[in-house]
């Protein structure tokens, strides 16, 4: 029986010793970390904005608008702050020099007190964050084909172009078609399409030959006669 009691007392003593040790180890990282102590003392996040920043002394307009802004906000609770600032600026310009003079005197007094309290003060305005412009352009595949429609004589005709050169030629063709009366629209479109295919496939003769065999050139029937026929 005494052996059992002694073992129980030993276990209780060990647990009592372990509990404070666990508590100390759990709080030691917080007390030993200088960053956490700095945040607790300053009440900020450790950056410059968390430190005590010295404010500029108020000028005459700020001294005058301090009470006027509160009055306008109470009279017009729905008015935004930007609108209140515009109204106060307009009212300040309408004041005479005699009406402004007491506020200039108060501003000079505040500036003198500020110089005595902060003799090494230097005004350092905050830099505005510049917006990041993304100059990244989406890559256009060379094999991608864009289709558009040409409106000629109140009819829509599909047209295909592959690159910027073809697009520029296509825009010139649209100007020509819109300025002049269209004559044989189908013939013009086929010739333009055949020209763009031949220019886009200029670097590969095998592919060009395949396209030429698949799409033979278009010859008007009026110009084709027996004298123009070729017999091998």
Curated annotation (Swiss-Prot):
InterPro entries for the chain: HMG_box_dom, HMG_box_dom_sf, SRY, SRY-related_HMG-box_TF-like
SMART domains per record: HMG
KW Chaperone (keyword) present: no
UniProt-annotated location(s): Nucleus speckle; Cytoplasm; Nucleus
Keywords from the UniProt entry: Activator, Calmodulin-binding, Cytoplasm, Differentiation, DNA-binding, Nucleus, Sexual differentiation, Transcription, Transcription regulation
GO BP terms in the entry: cell differentiation; male sex determination; sex differentiation
Main location group: nucleus
Origin: domain of life: Eukaryota
Region (Disordered) residue spans: 24-53
DNA-binding region: 54-122
Molecular-function GO terms, alphabetical: calmodulin binding; DNA-binding transcription activator activity, RNA polymerase II-specific; RNA polymerase II cis-regulatory region sequence-specific DNA binding
Gene Ontology cellular component annotations, sorted alphabetically: cytoplasm; nuclear speck; nucleus
Keyword DNA-binding applies: yes
Cleavable signal peptide: none
Subunit note: Interacts with CALM, EP300, HDAC3, KPNB1, ZNF208 isoform KRAB-O, PARP1, SLC9A3R2 and WT1. The interaction with EP300 modulates its DNA-binding activity. The interaction with KPNB1 is sensitive to dissociation by Ran in the GTP-bound form. Interaction with PARP1 impaired its DNA-binding activity.
Function (record text): Transcriptional regulator that controls a genetic switch in male development. It is necessary and sufficient for initiating male sex determination by directing the development of supporting cell precursors (pre-Sertoli cells) as Sertoli rather than granulosa cells. Involved in different aspects of gene regulation including promoter activation or repression. Binds to the DNA consensus sequence 5'-[AT]AACAA[AT]-3'. SRY HMG box recognizes DNA by partial intercalation in the minor groove and promotes DNA bending. Also involved in pre-mRNA splicing.
Family recorded in the similarity comment: Belongs to the SRY family.
Record protein name field: Sex-determining region Y protein
Lineage, broadest ranks: Eukaryota, Metazoa, Chordata, Craniata, Vertebrata
Recorded name of the encoding gene: SRY
């Amino acid at each position: 029986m005494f052996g059992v009691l002694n073992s129980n007392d030993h276990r209780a003593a060990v647990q009592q010793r372990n509990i404070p040790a666990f508590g100390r180890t759990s709080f030691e990282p917080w007390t030993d970390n200088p960053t956490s102590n700095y945040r607790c003392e300053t009440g900020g996040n450790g950056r410059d904005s968390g430190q005590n920043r010295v404010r500029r002394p108020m000028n005459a307009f700020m001294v005058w608008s301090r009470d006027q802004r509160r009055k306008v906000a109470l009279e017009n609770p729905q008015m935004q702050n930007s609108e209140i600032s515009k109204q106060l600026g307009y009212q300040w310009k309408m004041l005479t020099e005699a009406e402004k003079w007491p506020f200039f005197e108060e501003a000079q007094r505040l500036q003198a007190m500020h110089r005595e309290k902060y003799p090494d003060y230097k005004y350092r305005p905050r830099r505005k964050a510049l917006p990041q412009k993304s100059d990244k352009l989406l890559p256009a595949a060379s094999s991608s084909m864009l289709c558009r429609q040409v409106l000629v004589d109140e009819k829509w005709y599909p047209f295909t172009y592959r690159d910027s050169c073809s697009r520029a030629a296509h825009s010139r063709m649209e100007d020509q078609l819109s300025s002049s009366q269209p004559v044989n629209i189908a013939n013009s479109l086929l010739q333009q399409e055949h020209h763009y295919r031949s220019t886009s496939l200029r670097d590969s003769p095998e592919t060009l030959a395949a396209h030429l065999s698949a799409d033979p050139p278009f010859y008007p029937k009026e110009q084709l006669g027996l004298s123009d026929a070729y017999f091998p």
